[in-house]
Amino acid sequence: MKHLFSQSIFILSFFLLTGCKKNETTEIAKTEIPQNTIEYASGLSIVKHEGYSVVTVTNPWPNANKKFTYILKEKDVKVPDSLQKYSTIKVPLESVVVTSTTNIPFLEMLDVEDKLTGFPHTDYVSSEKTRKLIDKGAVKNVGQNEKLNIEQLIELAPDLIVTFGVDNNNPMLDNLKKSGLNVFIQADWMEQSPLGKAEWIKLYGALFGKEDKAKELFDKIVLSYEQAKKMVAAKQATSTVLYGSMYEDVWYVAKGNSWVAQFMKDARANYLWADLKGTGSEGLPFEKVLDKAKNANFWIATGSVKSLDEFAKMNPHYSEFDAFKNKRIYTFEGKLGATGGTIYYELSPSRPDLVLKDYINIFHPDLLPGYEFTFATKLN
C-alpha cells in the first residue's frame, strides 16, 4: 500500500511539474513574440527583434503589385536564415540621402539632420536648419526625383537612399539598385490618416537608432492632436466648406476619405464633398462645383495665392461664390521658404496637430483667442 501511495504521489508530482513547465513555456513564448510597433500608419510595419528590426512597406504607391521588406541590422548581429532574402540595412545610419521634403522634419526632430548628405532640387527645402547645411555645401543637390544624378550618388556613397515610387514602373529605382546603392522605398505620402503620416517618424527612429525618441515625439503629437479634437468636440459642424481651385479647366476637390477631408471632419466642419468615396481628389467641371458650393461659408483654396485680387485674376468666376464675397477664403500653401519651397508641403505631414489647430481657428476662432496660424493665411 505504501508503495502504491508513493507511486501515486510521483505520478501526480510529474503531471503537476510538467503542467507548470508547459504553462511557464507558454507564458515565455507569449512575452517573447515581437509585436508591430506601428499603430496608425496603414502602409508601414516595424517589428523589433533582438539586434534587428523587420520593416515592411505594404502600400508603396497606388495599385501597387508588390510590397517591400527590409532588415535593419545592428553591427555584428546575425539575422536568421529565413530573412536573408530581404534587403539588409546596417543601422544606425551615418549618412543618408532623402528625396522628399516631408522627410526633412523627421530628421530634424530626431537631431540627425547632419547625417543628410544629398537631396534632389535643394531649392524645395524650406527649413532654416537644413538650408544652412545646404548653403555651406554639406548637403549636395543630387538632381531631380525622376532623374537622380547616379554618378554623384555613387561618389557620395550614402549608407542609404530613402526615396519613393509613383507606380509599378520605376526605372530610376532599378538603376539605383543596379549601381550598388542601398535604397529604401518609403510611402508616407500614401497615408490618408493625419496621425498615420506622422507615425513614419518611427521609421527614421529605427534607421538612426533613436526608436525611443521617435516614439516619445510621436506620442506628444498624438496627445496634442487628440486634445485639439476634444476642444472642438462639443461644436456643431454647421460651417459648410468648399475646397480646391481650378486647374486647366478642371476643379479638383478632395475626396471624402482623403487626408484633407479628415482634418475638416476633426475640426467639426461640414465639408461639402465628405460623402465622395475614396482618397485623393476628383476632377469636376466648374459649373458642378458652383452649383453645390455657391453658398459655402468657407473656402479652402489651393495654391500660393496672396490676395483676393490676385485670386480673382486667376479666374473671374471665383467672385460668384459667397465665400469670396464675404472674404472667407484661406490657403495653406501661401507661406514659402527662402528659396520658394512650400512650408506646408514640407512640415504638415509630420505635424498634423498644428494643421488641425489651424483648421479649428478658421471654423471656430472663439476657441483659440490670440492664435497665430502655422500654415494657413487668409486672403484679403
Identify the function of each model-found stretch:
Residues 1-27:
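Bacterial Sec-dependent N-terminal signal peptides
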Residues 20-380:
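N-terminal ligand-binding lobe of clamshell/alpha-beta domains
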